[in-house]
From Swiss-Prot:
It comes from Thermodesulfovibrio yellowstonii (strain ATCC 51303 / DSM 11347 / YP87). It is found in: Cytoplasm. SUPFAM superfamilies: Ribulose-phoshate binding barrel (SSF51366). One of its GO terms (biological process) is L-histidine biosynthetic process. The keyword Cytoplasm applies. CDD domains: HisA (cd04732). Its EC number is 5.3.1.16. This is 1-(5-phosphoribosyl)-5-[(5-phosphoribosylamino)methylideneamino] imidazole-4-carboxamide isomerase. The gene is hisA. Its main location: cytoplasm.
Length: 244
């Protein structure tokens, strides 16, 4: 199982938002590539980059920072945040990003996902944000009647690379992940699933690592605040003999 550090970008800086609120921002690094190098040095093989300005505006907002992160980091990088246009996916892939994450558009325009999966095979990740098992869209503002597992199965049929599953009631709150909901989703699909939201301790990572077939877990606030030591977490996962 991969432990995947998150780098959230706003105004060219590495930040965290509390529960997705743009009014509650903590700046961790003025130069996001410094964060990328830190996590690489601590053993990360995959980075999760979110363009928060892009999520707000619906078009790429932090391309210079994304390029600098790509130059600094040797492993795989996935990027998301307001990606709703084919040209934005093309642009990100052209600067060396490995996989592109789409979110809200998967609910609003499933045909878009179908089309980009055909154009860019195994390059598309669908981010599914859910609250009480129901899909939330528009930066968590709106909860739909669509069940997360139903959406995941539909997207799997389109040929996505995998799914990032976020339990939004727990994200950035350090309350622990929703193990049951994550396990249910992993068991329902065949594509890789990456868990996100609420990971606050090495114990949380250990619990997630017990879910067979879970591909990875994203951690943000906990590694920046020091609640999780990334090196130690990676050592424990490997020491436990959990498959990566």
């Amino acid at each position: 199982m991969q432990i995947i550090p998150a780098i959230d970008l706003k105004d060219g800086k590495c930040v965290r938002l509390r529960q997705g609120k743009f009014s509650e921002v903590t700046v961790y690094y003025d130069n996001p590539e410094d964060a990328a190098l830190r996590w690489q040095n601590e053993g990360a093989e995959v980075l999760h980059v979110v363009d928060l300005d892009g999520a707000k505006e619906g078009k790429i907002g932090n391309l210079p920072s994304i390029k600098k992160i790509r130059e600094a980091f040797r492993g795989n990088i996935e990027v998301g945040g307001g990606i709703r246009r084919i040209e934005d996916i093309e642009l990100l892939l052209s600067v060396g990003i490995d996989r592109v994450i789409v979110g809200t558009i998967a609910v609003q325009s499933p045909d878009f996902v179908k089309e980009v999966c055909k154009r860019f095979p195994k390059k598309i990740i669908v981010g599914i944000d859910a609250k009480d098992g129901l899909v939330a869209v528009k930066g968590w503002v709106e909860v739909t009647e669509i069940r997360a597992i139903e959406l995941a199965l539909k997207m799997q049929d389109y040929g996505i690379w995998g799914i990032i599953y976020t339990d939004i009631s727990r994200d950035g709150m350090l309350t622990g992940p929703n193990i049951e909901a994550t396990k249910a989703l992993v068991e329902s699909v065949k594509v890789p699933v990456i868990a996100s939201g609420g990971v606050s301790s090495i114990e949380d990572i250990r619990k997630l690592a017990e879910i067979p077939q879970l591909w990875g877990v994203i951690t943000g606030k906990a590694i920046y605040s020091g609640a999780i030591d990334l090196k130690e977490a990676l050592r424990i996962i490997k020491g436990d003999g959990v498959k990566k």
